[in-house]
């Protein structure tokens, strides 16, 4: 669940932009459960996403227990997620079953200025219940990165910094915010509403000029 940092309260002391930025980043970082390099399992071997990137993988998922698995295809990811759900059911690291009225989230087929999804695999905007999913390219194409655990994610740790061009939020509750880290000023954010997608971040204006495509340094959910 996203909790927005830096909310103003009555009587709060006035701070400069740099101090405000540092305070907000510290508050968000307090929600980070992971430390150190991100080590993933891919084709039965360990790979260091932080130091060495994805290799030939096209799809990586961080599960609630913070383990990361990478895959070549989306059907492999779906099978691994089903196995994880079965193994972790009833534990603190379980993936919750969707309640009545909720399910996997699927965006609609591509039209100008709208969300888009084409087919399963590349171009799919399907996002499992309880997850937030990022894509490398617009309209849900390219490498995809999925998160189930709430908190702040330094996308550089996953070799995904400045690489997000579309996002879907199907978390259990709350929004999902992408942040761009700035020096000496508050970090801009763009929020994806609960049970929603932004299929083309290049179409959203960025506060300091340009657009939001390939700008995100951090995800908070």
Language-model region placement:
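Compact beta-sheet-dominated domain cores in extracellular/mature segments
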Residues: 6, 13-221
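Bacterial N-terminal signal peptides
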Residues: 1-5
């Amino acid at each position: 669940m996203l909790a927005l940092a830096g909310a103003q309260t009555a009587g709060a002391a006035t701070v400069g932009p740099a101090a405000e930025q540092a305070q907000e980043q510290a508050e968000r970082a307090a929600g980070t459960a992971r430390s150190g390099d991100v080590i993933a399992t891919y084709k039965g071997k360990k790979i260091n996403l932080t130091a060495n990137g994805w290799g030939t993988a096209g799809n990586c998922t961080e599960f609630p227990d913070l383990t990361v698995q990478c895959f070549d295809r989306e059907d492999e990811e779906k099978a691994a997620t089903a196995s994880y759900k079965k193994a972790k059911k009833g534990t603190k690291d379980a993936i919750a079953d969707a309640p009545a009225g909720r399910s996997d989230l699927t965006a609609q087929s591509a039209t100008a200025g709208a969300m888009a999804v084409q087919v399963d695999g590349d171009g799919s905007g399907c996002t499992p219940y309880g997850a937030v999913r990022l894509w490398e390219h617009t309209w849900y194409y390219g490498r995809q990165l999925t998160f189930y655990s709430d908190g702040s994610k330094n996308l550089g740790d996953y070799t995904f910094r400045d690489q997000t061009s579309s996002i879907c939020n199907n978390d259990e509750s709350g929004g999902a915010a992408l942040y761009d880290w700035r020096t000496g000023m508050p970090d801009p954010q763009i929020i994806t509403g609960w049970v929603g997608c932004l299929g083309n971040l290049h179409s959203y204006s960025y506060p300091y000029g340009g657009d939001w495509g390939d700008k995100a340094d951090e995800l908070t959910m």
